[in-house]
């Protein structure tokens, strides 16, 4: 039907007769001449319909926004003074010879160039929202990322293997989406949270370099960077150490950013231990664009009169830390109160501070409600450690280690960006040497920090039985600008070690056999050393496009309530369908919004 795309027309087409198909972006009537901005996936071109064209002009008069048209016409220069440098086709226009309305359109609920739409209306009319140039750009960029990924992995000997979507329910940290089996009454499949176990089994099978760009499903509370179904670049390889895998994956991410958005990432990525990241940044996903670090003060506050600091310093598992804000002395009381409320979200009970007005005046040059509770030598040591300067402000956190890290870590990022301290550079890094386990206070048992198939660090295997809290893992996370974009590890390839990890997690042998017997059996048949990583495709594309929500880079996403406003899913089903699945709903379980 068409010879060219609208957005691809330029001065090279001058004098040619072409046929275009697309949607009416805008129609204008100027002095009897009708101008149409015709849009397709490549962009917009200006169409001109002259009243002398007695066949086409009456049709053009009927045209409205979002009508679908087929137009044939002559490419010519735009008149002097009407060139539009804002679009690639801005130097030319197409003079209509014939025009056909392929399909009219109802009046759309919004304009395609409206940037202030509510997300609800966008998701309800997603098929229209996807016509908008910004969304077209996002989805096409996503395609470029997946294509570049496939090319890189193919060049490095990886093969694409599909793994099952209907699988067994196994605990991986979030709720499973369950699918009832009609044939096997009372039994359920689970949609995969990841292909973790299957890709390990592929390593046992001898497919030593596997990848898959696959859908994963997690029934969890949603945020801007989470969806109930999401896409993962899943990778596994045999006979490589963690440094080999990290080097290879660095190369892949560098290639993606260079090829897709023309960004050169550093080579190599810096590497930092989990303990160092928490100590310096209060987060295992540090945003290195922010040049602020936490300063340790626990040892200084052991005997100070200020009880809040003293108690946190003396109690096991407590921490006192400081965050210096360059130029923060200009912060108003109102702004400090807002930051105090902010850290309260993370469990902090308050936010002490000291303003540095004039260091030459000693204690007299400082301003703070807590100064009277702190001996001068302690204050001077604090100022030296934080390297505070005149005009700075120092915030303090004093509580359990987790609370201090969470609160000051989040405050560090917030202040860094709000006060213009962050750079505009891309700052990737690897975080390594994660703990194997974290203690669950509610359940009073250890939980796997990553997943229970992560191998312990060399020399840490004995801790699995004696002191799980000391065991480090061979896990590694790739972090970019404060966001985890990929996480992986060397896996356990010996059955005896896997059994020890299950025991440390308080998973009894019979339960382990029931849930993971197939894996334990496979590990006894010559399983090779192996490891891998998974990248969040949605998150990577969102960062490349500069959007805050992965919903802007997914064609048909769900809301934060895991609903599709377009199709009204999830929905009720017919009683007959439930009977076939041997399911009966109790009325007390049925809720309506």
Swiss-Prot record:
<dbReference type="GO" id="GO:0003676">
    <property type="term" value="F:nucleic acid binding"/>
</dbReference>
<feature type="binding site">
    <location>
        <position position="484"/>
    </location>
    <ligand>
        <name>ATP</name>
    </ligand>
</feature>
<dbReference type="InterPro" id="IPR045864">
    <property type="entry name" value="aa-tRNA-synth_II/BPL/LPL"/>
</dbReference>
<comment type="similarity">
    <text>Belongs to the class-II aminoacyl-tRNA synthetase family. Type 1 subfamily.</text>
</comment>
<keyword id="KW-0963">Cytoplasm</keyword>
<dbReference type="Pfam" id="PF02938">
    <property type="entry name" value="GAD"/>
</dbReference>
<feature type="binding site">
    <location>
        <begin position="218"/>
        <end position="220"/>
    </location>
    <ligand>
        <name>ATP</name>
    </ligand>
</feature>
<keyword id="KW-0067">ATP-binding</keyword>
<dbReference type="InterPro" id="IPR047089">
    <property type="entry name" value="Asp-tRNA-ligase_1_N"/>
</dbReference>
<feature type="region of interest" description="Aspartate">
    <location>
        <begin position="196"/>
        <end position="199"/>
    </location>
</feature>
<dbReference type="InterPro" id="IPR006195">
    <property type="entry name" value="aa-tRNA-synth_II"/>
</dbReference>
<dbReference type="GO" id="GO:0006422">
    <property type="term" value="P:aspartyl-tRNA aminoacylation"/>
</dbReference>
<dbReference type="InterPro" id="IPR047090">
    <property type="entry name" value="AspRS_core"/>
</dbReference>
<feature type="binding site">
    <location>
        <position position="172"/>
    </location>
    <ligand>
        <name>L-aspartate</name>
    </ligand>
</feature>
<dbReference type="InterPro" id="IPR004364">
    <property type="entry name" value="Aa-tRNA-synt_II"/>
</dbReference>
<feature type="binding site">
    <location>
        <position position="450"/>
    </location>
    <ligand>
        <name>L-aspartate</name>
    </ligand>
</feature>
<comment type="subunit">
    <text>Homodimer.</text>
</comment>
<dbReference type="InterPro" id="IPR004524">
    <property type="entry name" value="Asp-tRNA-ligase_1"/>
</dbReference>
<feature type="binding site">
    <location>
        <begin position="536"/>
        <end position="539"/>
    </location>
    <ligand>
        <name>ATP</name>
    </ligand>
</feature>
<dbReference type="GO" id="GO:0050560">
    <property type="term" value="F:aspartate-tRNA(Asn) ligase activity"/>
</dbReference>
<dbReference type="GO" id="GO:0004815">
    <property type="term" value="F:aspartate-tRNA ligase activity"/>
</dbReference>
<comment type="function">
    <text>Aspartyl-tRNA synthetase with relaxed tRNA specificity since it is able to aspartylate not only its cognate tRNA(Asp) but also tRNA(Asn). Reaction proceeds in two steps: L-aspartate is first activated by ATP to form Asp-AMP and then transferred to the acceptor end of tRNA(Asp/Asn).</text>
</comment>
<protein>
    <recommendedName>
        <fullName>Aspartate--tRNA(Asp/Asn) ligase</fullName>
        <ecNumber>6.1.1.23</ecNumber>
    </recommendedName>
</protein>
<dbReference type="InterPro" id="IPR029351">
    <property type="entry name" value="GAD_dom"/>
</dbReference>
<dbReference type="InterPro" id="IPR004115">
    <property type="entry name" value="GAD-like_sf"/>
</dbReference>
<dbReference type="InterPro" id="IPR004365">
    <property type="entry name" value="NA-bd_OB_tRNA"/>
</dbReference>
<dbReference type="GO" id="GO:0005524">
    <property type="term" value="F:ATP binding"/>
</dbReference>
<feature type="binding site">
    <location>
        <position position="491"/>
    </location>
    <ligand>
        <name>L-aspartate</name>
    </ligand>
</feature>
<dbReference type="InterPro" id="IPR002312">
    <property type="entry name" value="Asp/Asn-tRNA-synth_IIb"/>
</dbReference>
<feature type="site" description="Important for tRNA non-discrimination">
    <location>
        <position position="30"/>
    </location>
</feature>
<keyword id="KW-0030">Aminoacyl-tRNA synthetase</keyword>
<dbReference type="Pfam" id="PF01336">
    <property type="entry name" value="tRNA_anti-codon"/>
</dbReference>
<keyword id="KW-0436">Ligase</keyword>
<feature type="binding site">
    <location>
        <position position="227"/>
    </location>
    <ligand>
        <name>ATP</name>
    </ligand>
</feature>
<dbReference type="GO" id="GO:0005737">
    <property type="term" value="C:cytoplasm"/>
</dbReference>
<feature type="site" description="Important for tRNA non-discrimination">
    <location>
        <position position="81"/>
    </location>
</feature>
<dbReference type="InterPro" id="IPR012340">
    <property type="entry name" value="NA-bd_OB-fold"/>
</dbReference>
<dbReference type="Pfam" id="PF00152">
    <property type="entry name" value="tRNA-synt_2"/>
</dbReference>
<feature type="binding site">
    <location>
        <position position="218"/>
    </location>
    <ligand>
        <name>L-aspartate</name>
    </ligand>
</feature>
<keyword id="KW-0547">Nucleotide-binding</keyword>
<keyword id="KW-0648">Protein biosynthesis</keyword>
